[in-house]
UniProtKB/Swiss-Prot annotation:
Similarity comment: Belongs to the intron maturase 2 family. MatK subfamily.
Name of the protein in question: Maturase K
Record carries keyword Plastid: yes
GO biological process: mRNA processing; RNA splicing; tRNA processing
Keywords: Chloroplast, mRNA processing, Plastid, RNA-binding, tRNA processing
Gene: matK
Localization, UniProt: Plastid, Chloroplast
Organism field: Nicotiana bigelovii (Bigelov's tobacco)
Function summary: Usually encoded in the trnK tRNA gene intron. Probably assists in splicing its own and other chloroplast group II introns.
Highest taxon in the source lineage: Eukaryota
Any one Gene Ontology molecular-function term assigned to this protein's record: RNA binding
Transmembrane segments: none
Record lineage: Eukaryota, Viridiplantae, Streptophyta, Embryophyta, Tracheophyta
Gene Ontology CC terms: chloroplast
Length: 509
């Protein structure tokens, strides 16, 4: 009971963090206007005072200083007459949204740091490692090999802007900030301009991306946190009583009823959704829910999710947004990789006295491959090759120096090798490397008005060194004559924790 109360109870200190937009009033909307402030953001999160979290005094002084330099003020009474808007309407609306996003991100950052500090004996966990895209793959590699079915979910979007404001109402206790947010959303944008659904997942406009991503993540976080709580408590509650926990505002009035459910109805609890091997991952506007259970169980979860999100979070579900797939028979595009769980057959011979036995054993293995066709399509779109994969020159770079051209091609090659280092098979990467290297040679030959063969004879070693990856460079220095050592390294998978974004050439979509 105490665990449930701790989970759903809002931390008072976190509520207090949101009082400073009311204290600072209009000053907060100049916060994001200083380009150097984001680089020195730690000054807002460090305080030599009592709690070592943040300093109201430092923030107040910074905001006041920037406000005096910018000299602007919003007046909602004579909104149409105010010269603040005019031709710079988009510019100042972007300033407002970025300022609001910057302010509300601070308590969420503190909350993340405090939650991570509970790991490893109150030792501060390196949260930047969790930001890496590759940090998800070791989790999938360790867990998905033991699972059977997966729900591929395209996360829907809210049907009305007011839902986004209502979601923040649980955390932001400053009424003036919420009113300004509501006014801002309804004045400048409608839902179609906020979130576009032309492609799978979400596509935000380039303006105010930080603001929209915050609203979207806070909204999805609210859906996920309540859903995870209900999933964890599914073995203790009846399937008809979960609705009482969804309305956080009235939660404390229903605590006594919850105690009665635990005390009286435990013997007749329905175990419809009990599954200890359930894993959830969200990425790029999508999510996957994998289970070790049967098809019937995962199908129940499908209908449960649809009803849960539609009824209680007003999410708009369309046909085809959620699919059930068997892991052993299905490959999916996941963060630029083609991932699947395949059976790795092996044969074991056992001999007892004069009798021998052959035992066939199949082991599930999480497999990650480089999607060659989409990757060649990205190279063709960038004019490095044709759609069939034949290298061509890049005339746009012909005006650059030879060293700059070689450096650009080499950087693209190393970045692709770095991102796809977790691939089970590296043969595709060597084909991409061949395309980029020959495209570089054709570009240089075009610049010097010579043939590719002549240019490679003259500077072939320089091209070879520039296209070496970091692993190849280490091995070439350690084992200069043992070229076979490269094969052993590239047959293994390596996951890096310093990759925070996907380059267009590394994205399969």
């Amino acid at each position: 009971m105490e665990e449930i109360q701790r989970y759903l109870q809002l931390d008072r200190s976190q509520q207090h963090n949101f009082l400073y937009p009311l204290i600072f009033q209009e000053y907060i909307y100049a916060l994001a206007h200083d380009p150097g402030l984001n680089r020195n953001r730690s000054i807002l999160l460090e305080n030599p005072g009592s709690n070592n979290k943040f300093s109201f005094l430092i923030v107040k002084r910074l905001i006041t200083r920037m406000y005096q330099q910018n000299h602007f003020l919003i007046s909602t009474n004579d909104f149409n007459k105010n010269s603040f808007l005019g031709c710079n309407k988009n510019l100042y609306s972007q300033m407002i949204s970025e300022g609001f996003a910057f302010i509300v991100e601070i308590p969420f950052s503190l909350r993340l740091i405090s939650s991570l500090s509970s790991f490893e004996g109150k030792k501060i966990f390196k949260s930047h490692n969790l930001r890496s895209i590759h940090s998800t793959f070791p989790f999938l590699e360790d867990n998905f090999a033991h699972l059977n079915y997966v729900l591929d979910i395209l996360i829907p979007y809210p049907v009305h802007l007011e839902i986004l404001v209502q979601t923040l109402r649980y955390w932001v206790k400053d009424a003036s900030s919420l009113h300004l947010l509501r006014f801002f959303l309804h004045e400048y944008w409608n839902l179609n301009s906020l979130i576009t659904s032309k492609k799978p997942g979400y596509s935000f406009s380039k303006k105010n991306q930080r603001f929209f991503f915050f609203l979207y993540n806070s909204y999805v976080y609210e859906c996920e946190s309540t859903f995870v709580f209900l999933r964890n408590q599914s073995s203790h509650l009846r399937s008809t009583s979960f609705g009482a926990l969804l309305e956080r505002i009235f939660f404390y009035g229903k605590i006594e009823r919850l105690v009665e459910v635990f005390a009286k109805d435990f013997q007749v609890t329905l175990w419809l959704f009990k599954d200890p091997f359930m894993h959830y991952v969200r990425y790029q506007g999508k999510s996957i829910l994998a289970s070790k259970g049967t098809f019937l169980l995962i199908n129940k979860w499908k209908f449960y999710l649809v009803n849960f999100w539609q009824c209680h979070f007003s999410l708009c579900f369309h046909t085809g947004r959620i699919h059930i797939n068997q892991l052993s028979n299905h490959s999916r595009d996941f963060m630029g990789y083609l991932s699947s769980v395949r059976l790795n057959p092996s044969m074991v011979r056992s001999q007892m006295l004069e009798n021998s036995f052959l035992i066939n054993n199949a082991i599930k293995k999480f497999d990650t491959l480089v999607p060659i066709i989409p990757l060649i399509g990205s190279l063709a779109k960038a004019n490095f090759c044709t759609v069939l994969g034949h290298p061509i020159s890049k005339p746009v770079w012909s005006d650059l120096s030879d060293s700059d051209i070689i450096a650009r091609f080499g950087r693209i090659c190393r970045n692709l090798f770095h991102y796809y280092s977790g691939s089970s098979k590296k043969k595709t990467l060597y084909r991409i490397k061949y395309i980029l290297r020959l495209s570089c040679a054709r570009t240089l030959a075009r610049k010097h008005k010579s043939t590719v063969r002549t240019f490679l004879k003259r500077s072939g070693s320089e091209l070879l060194e520039e296209f070496l990856t970091s692993e190849e460079q280490v091995l070439s220095l350690t084992f200069p004559r043992a070229s076979s050592s490269l094969g052993g390294v590239y047959r293994s998978r390596i996951w890096y924790l310093d990759i925070f974004c996907i380059n267009d050439l590394a994205n399969s979509q």
